[in-house]
Amino acid sequence: MKNRINELRKENKLSQMDLADIVGTTRQTITSIEVGKYTASLPLAYKIARHFGLKIEDIFDFTDIDEEV
């Protein structure tokens, strides 16, 4: 799933480890989400969105969801 995490993280001068610590996950999970290898769970997506002060749909691109189902 496409997302803006890398862009938002860099705008906020956060490393992958910084964001992982903030949202309670691992750096590897953040890396996998950023490159599209892993889709964040709803609770994790919510924590990421809340940290950046955005809605989930402002970070994650759901247009491909219908094709994946």
Located regions from the model:
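Short, basic-rich loop-to-helix N-cap that marks the start of a DNA-contacting helix
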Residues: 37-47, 66
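DNA major-groove recognition helix of helix-turn-helix/homeodomain DNA-binding modules
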Residues: 43-58
